């Protein structure tokens, strides 16, 4: 089976590929070799815009040899429409069915959603099977394209050993007098993420409260791109400004690599509250990381985030605060509510355990491949 993108850690966990010996990438441009996904082919933001995207799918030098099935998650957004058509035509000509998991109905990083919508529509209509993560997303896909997806809830991203290690290490990142540690996830600082304005809006959380700490979590390459050669000085300036004006006991910048979340897990586990400041979204893998590590998320009322987090449970009994992004004061109110009334994260729904998720995918693969 070929998987796009095969190297993405979330994808591998979602479909249970970590133990697989033969995982192939679906390269949507020439020159990608068998086995592992090169880093530059994982996300559209990391792709060379001058590269030729032919739509051909190669395994080593021989197209589609020994490939029975393709599973596409994401990573196709950078393609021109004719290249997406070429991918579909190439698969049809070779007689290789493909499964599509729709993580994002709206473009996850840019306001112009038309290219992503067109790409997704082309793939949805051609796929042998379509999967998504929530019932409300499945309904939206049916309304838009008349397809009836299989809903496979998001499984956990971390196993018990990883969770225990992160929690233990996270305790060493907090002092005995740190009653509140708030994280703000800026990800790649794309158009879908609120920036400095939101950091300013969080100032009331720390005012009049001793021992409130702020952690700004950002993807390392995005930070390097934003700050250029002055990235260290820029980071120190931002931290100093927020610490002085926001009243935080401390402010620290936490950078992570997109393909290696291991080092950032203790930082995440050390948080009491994590703000996910999306301007628009469909689902969020980071919500599932909060669930794994027992961190209370604060997120806006956009996309299907609320449905994903509170899937089939009572919001009043569990952690997680939803705020109105149109109200400048709402995010601080939500963070205060989350910190002053700590509750357990919602449990995962039936069918989200790793064994069931893997079994469900295996059944879908067999049906799509005609086996």
Give names to the regions the model predicted.
Residues 38-126, 135:
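Extended catalytic core of nucleotide-activated donor transferases of GT-like folds
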Residues 322, 326-329, 333-371:
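A charged, aromatic-enriched C-terminal amphipathic alpha-helix characteristic of glycosyltransferases
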Residues 31-32, 152-168, 188, 221-223, ...:
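Short beta-strand->alpha-helix junction loop in the catalytic core
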Residues 228-266, 273:
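Nucleotide-activated donor-binding/catalytic signature segment of Leloir-type glycosyltransferases, i.e.
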Residues 171-199, 203, 215-216:
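Conserved donor-binding/catalytic core segment of Leloir-type glycosyltransferases
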Residues 125-168:
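Donor nucleotide-sugar binding/catalytic pocket of nucleotide-sugar-dependent glycosyltransferases
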Residues 290, 296-306:
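Short hydrophobic beta-strand element within catalytic cores of glycosyltransferases
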């Amino acid at each position: 089976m070929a998987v796009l993108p095969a190297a993405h850690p979330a994808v591998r966990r979602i479909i249970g590929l970590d133990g697989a010996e033969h995982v192939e990438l679906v390269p949507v441009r020439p020159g990608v070799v068998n086995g592992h996904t090169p880093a530059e082919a994982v996300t559209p933001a990391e792709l060379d815009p001058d590269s030729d995207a032919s739509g051909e799918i190669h395994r080593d030098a021989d197209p589609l040899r020994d490939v029975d099935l393709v599973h596409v998650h994401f990573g196709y957004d950078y393609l021109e429409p004719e290249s997406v058509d070429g991918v579909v035509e190439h698969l049809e000509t070779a007689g290789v069915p493909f499964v599509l998991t729709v993580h994002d109905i709206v473009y996850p990083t840019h306001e112009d959603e038309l290219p992503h919508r067109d790409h997704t529509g082309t793939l949805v209509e051609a796929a042998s099977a379509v999967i998504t993560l929530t019932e409300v997303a499945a309904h939206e896909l049916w309304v838009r394209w008349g397809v009836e997806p299989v809903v496979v809830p998001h499984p956990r991203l971390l196993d018990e050993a990883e969770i225990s290690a992160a929690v233990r290490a996270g305790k060493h990142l907090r002092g005995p007098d740190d009653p509140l540690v708030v994280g703000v996830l800026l990800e790649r600082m794309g158009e879908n993420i609120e920036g400095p304005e939101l950091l300013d809006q969080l100032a009331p959380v720390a005012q009049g409260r001793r021992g409130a700490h702020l952690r700004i979590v950002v993807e390392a390459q995005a930070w390097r791109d934003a700050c250029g050669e002055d990235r260290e000085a820029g980071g120190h300036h931002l931290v100093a400004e927020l610490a002085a004006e926001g009243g935080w006991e401390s402010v620290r910048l936490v950078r992570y690599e997109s393909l290696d979340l291991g080092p950032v897990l203790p930082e995440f586990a050390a948080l009491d509250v994590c703000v996910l400041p999306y301007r628009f979204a469909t689902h969020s893998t980071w919500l599932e990381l909060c669930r794994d590590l027992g961190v209370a998320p604060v997120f806006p009322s956009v996309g299907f985030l609320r449905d994903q987090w509170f899937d089939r449970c009572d919001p009043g009994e569990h952690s997680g605060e939803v705020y109105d992004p149109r109200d400048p004061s709402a995010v601080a109110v939500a963070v205060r509510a989350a910190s002053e009334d700590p509750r357990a994260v919602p449990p995962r729904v039936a069918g989200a355990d790793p064994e069931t998720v893997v079994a469900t995918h295996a059944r879908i693969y067999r049906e799509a491949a005609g086996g």
